[in-house]
């Protein structure tokens, strides 16, 4: 069985382990009615993978954006993984009903990303398992595709920057304390070594505020200054400071997009509110932006090569293979994409040892 079974199933039955209720529901086998569990382990969370819906609402319901983070936390806590398609959420600049404009999808995805990174799945050292999916016609699709590689470039900048700061701090301190004249060591006019060290630091883009801090501390008698040395370890401090590292990110690709790529055509992006209005008024939606389909496909290919995301989910093919098409459209998948089904459903994974 998959991890939630190992983490949860049988703990109450075999050992009498209980836990405070967490909002889990169960079907009473005798009455057939749904009830709330009074213990986290008496009727445990055994399902491995979930697909959850999310609406274009900040708060106010379990399917709201903030409601989804709460549901995800509950699933992660007991060892399950979850995926959602976020295409219903308005893009940056779309009008809000209460006035103003939306801050965009990425601002909300970063909240969920940070929450997932803080939770140990099943109380163990395993990270939370999370899938984020977005339709290719979403107005924030370009920013979404670039999200993870841009954040990983920030990690490289942090690693390089920490080394550069340390190198120039050492150089400036050395130029000060190796100068023989106590009165002139802090003057760039008399201490040419200090002047050269500062010029080198400025040329390497060391912020002048950092240079001034080094000088101020030296005047107070400091002989050295230690900056934290960052590295590219995925569990290190550099990666902990950036976003987009706690989910698998995928794009939903319809056949119409691939046809546009092959024909050298264009691809349109649509505000979510415009798509809803067009559907209500039985008309074609007006695009908010039009892209070269081939260029967008190249962006997907490059970022997948650069950082292994986004993954590609072929939306048309997936729904052609749908086993329950009358029940609704398949919009997303679980974190590993082996389970593709309706929103707000779950499955139990298992494996067989063939050795």
Regions found by a protein language model. Give the residues of each.
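Extended catalytic cores of very large enzyme megasubunits
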Residues: 1-355
């Amino acid at each position: 069985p998959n991890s939630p079974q190992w983490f949860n199933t049988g703990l109450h039955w075999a050992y009498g382990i209980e836990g405070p209720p967490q909002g889990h529901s169960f079907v009473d086998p005798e009455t057939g009615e749904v009830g709330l569990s009074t213990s986290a382990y008496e009727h445990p969370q055994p399902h491995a993978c979930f697909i959850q819906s999310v609406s274009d609402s900040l708060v106010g319901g379990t399917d709201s954006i903030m409601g989804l983070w709460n549901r995800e936390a509950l699933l992660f806590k007991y060892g399950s993984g979850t995926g959602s398609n976020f295409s219903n959420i308005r893009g940056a600049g779309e009008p809000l009903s209460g006035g103003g404009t939306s801050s965009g999808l990425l601002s909300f995805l970063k909240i969920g990303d940070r929450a997932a990174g803080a939770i140990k799945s099943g109380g163990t050292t395993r990270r939370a398992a999370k899938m984020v999916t977005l339709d290719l016609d979403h107005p924030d699709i370009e920013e979404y595709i670039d999200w993870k590689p841009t954040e990983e470039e920030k990690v490289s900048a942090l690693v390089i920057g920490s080394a550069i700061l340390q190198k120039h701090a050492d150089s400036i301190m050395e130029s000060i304390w190796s100068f023989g004249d106590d009165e002139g060591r802090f003057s760039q006019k008399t201490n040419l070594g200090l002047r050269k060290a500062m010029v080198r630091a400025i040329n390497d883009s060391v912020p002048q505020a950092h240079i001034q801090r080094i000088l101020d501390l030296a005047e107070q008698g400091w002989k050295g200054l230690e900056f934290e040395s960052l590295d590219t370890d995925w569990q290190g401090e550099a990666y902990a400071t950036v976003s987009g590292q706690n989910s698998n990110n995928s794009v939903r690709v319809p056949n119409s997009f691939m046809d546009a790529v092959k024909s050298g055509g264009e691809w349109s992006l649509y505000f979510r509110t415009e798509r809803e209005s067009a559907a209500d008024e039985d008309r074609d939606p007006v695009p908010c932006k039009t892209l070269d389909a081939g260029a967008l496909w190249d962006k997907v290919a490059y970022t997948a090569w650069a950082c292994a995301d986004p993954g590609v989910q072929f939306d048309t093919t997936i729904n052609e293979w749908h086993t329950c098409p009358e029940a609704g459209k398949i919009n997303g998948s679980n974190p590993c994409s082996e389970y593709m089904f309706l929103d707000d459903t779950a499955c139990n994974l298992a494996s067989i040892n063939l050795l």
